[in-house]
């Protein structure tokens, strides 16, 4: 079944203050660090993150990340998928994902 994409802001409309507020929470940073470490940018289920918080609170955190433009959410009806918006983030804020511990961008890796 095809999912319905829950859309955040366009790449050019990403706001640094909104992004920093979204990353200000340790649980949201944890999700972003996990997503950024997966260089294949594969879709993950909301329940695939080991977060010590309720399902309702997780839903809130994913909504904040989506509204900040950091992730896409795909609604399949009975579950949601999460995907990092790596290209949009790197285009608007180069190096931001590297600051989350995902390693240096490919073109600045030590030789």
Stretches found by the model and what they are:
Residues 73:
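Short beta-strand "wing" residues that participate in macromolecule-binding interfaces
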Residues 65-68, 79-82, 98-100:
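A general structural signal for short secondary-structure boundary/capping elements
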Residues 27, 69, 100-104:
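Generic low-complexity, intrinsically disordered sequence content enriched
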Residues 25, 61, 94:
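Conserved acidic functional residues
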Residues 1-17, 33-38, 85-111:
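Amphipathic alpha-helical dimerization/coiled-coil segments
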Residues 18-22, 26-54, 76-88:
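N-terminal helix-turn-helix DNA-binding core of bacterial DNA-binding proteins
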Residues 47-70:
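Canonical helix-turn-helix DNA-binding module
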